[in-house]
Amino acid sequence: MALVHKLLRGTYFLRKFXKPTSALYPFLGIRFAEYSSSLQKPVASPGKASSQRKTEGDLQGDHQKEVALDITSSEEKPDVSFDKAIRDEAMYHFRHLKDEIVDHWRGPEGHPLHEVLLEQAKVVWQFRGKEDLDKWTVTSDKTIGGRSEVFLKMGKNNQSALLYGTLSSEAPQDGESTRSGYCAMISRIPRGAFERKMSYDWSQFNTLYLRVRGDGRPWMVNIKEDTDFFQRTNQMYSYFMFTRGGPYWQEVKIPFSKFFFSNRGRIRDVQHELPLDKISSIGFTLADKVDGPFFLEIDFIGVFTDPAHTEEFAYENSPELNPRLFK
């Protein structure tokens, strides 16, 4: 009977399903999930708040204090308006779509075409606050049973991103894995209105430009192509970045023509040029088999046009290696 009484009054569902964000997020988006979560917060009842007072003997020489307990009455239920939440979510995406259409007619990424054609450099990612860190994600071999750990936080004075952790090449004791030891930092895929996948267009630039400070370890810089084919999800273009250690910043310039093609971590004999007009993400991977702590501090990541670099592709192609290019 007590369970039936709770079901009729609605308190059972409010207690068991206090945070519906995990269930509603895939269907209604982030904004609706945050809105519905805020509705489940307990609200203080000023007319029914209980108080506790000290006795007169304990109040000698002290000021009288009153402690209010925020207790939500079982009769009061949060007013959940799903129609309003769905309407607000739809209006947000439509406003976002309107801005995208206006920017498209104005020019690439909302800039006039003549300014884009004359643009020689552009900062794509910089780290000046927590919202910049939210555009990235970190991962390690801990997901497959390894012992490596990696963390990402803001650097000193909130002017850089600090990637740090501990690398361990000890293989997981699962009876299958024989190698381990990697940590990575990957940018999130940009999203447009209605959670559509977006991409970066770097076709007018020829060099990747970074300002970093490390501990002397070599890193792998990985760039992924935007694709809808499941077979290409493990394909990427990579090159090495060597940090020299010490307290000073270093500027790293890597031409896009140097990036080599790999699939599932293996360099392929058949090499392809990096498609700069549809870049989905960039990442940094550490896997040098040197166990111990590490760190990499990043100021910004950008692209620019180097007039002195005229190379289009650094790797040889021949009819034996890549017969499709010579048909």
Swiss-Prot record:
State a GO cellular component annotated for this protein: mitochondrial matrix
- InterPro entries in UniProt: Galactose-bd-like_sf, NADH-UbQ_OxRdtase-assoc_prot30, NDUFAF1
Could you tell me which residues belong to the region Disordered? 42-63
- Ranges of biased composition (kind: Basic and acidic residues): 53-63
Q: Which Pfam families match?
A: CIA30 (PF08547)
Transit peptide: which residues? 1-24
| UniProt-annotated location(s) | Mitochondrion; Mitochondrion matrix
Name its GO BP terms in alphabetical order: mitochondrial electron transport, NADH to ubiquinone; mitochondrial respiratory chain complex I assembly
Modified residues annotated as Phosphoserine in this record: S318
Keywords of the record: Chaperone, Mitochondrion, Phosphoprotein, Transit peptide
The answer to whether keyword Acyltransferase applies is no
SUPFAM superfamilies named in the record? Galactose-binding domain-like (SSF49785)
Signal peptide as annotated in the record: none
* GO terms for MF: unfolded protein binding
Q: Which family does it belong to?
A: Belongs to the CIA30 family.
Description of how the protein assembles with itself and partners: Part of the mitochondrial complex I assembly/MCIA complex that comprises at least the core subunits TMEM126B, NDUFAF1, ECSIT and ACAD9 and complement subunits such as COA1 and TMEM186. Interacts with ECSIT. Interacts with ACAD9. At early stages of complex I assembly, it is found in intermediate subcomplexes that contain different subunits including NDUFB6, NDUFA6, NDUFA9, NDUFS3, NDUFS7, ND1, ND2 and ND3. Interacts with TMEM70 and TMEM242.
Biological function: As part of the MCIA complex, involved in the assembly of the mitochondrial complex I.
Q: What is this protein called?
A: Complex I intermediate-associated protein 30, mitochondrial
Q: Which gene encodes it?
A: NDUFAF1
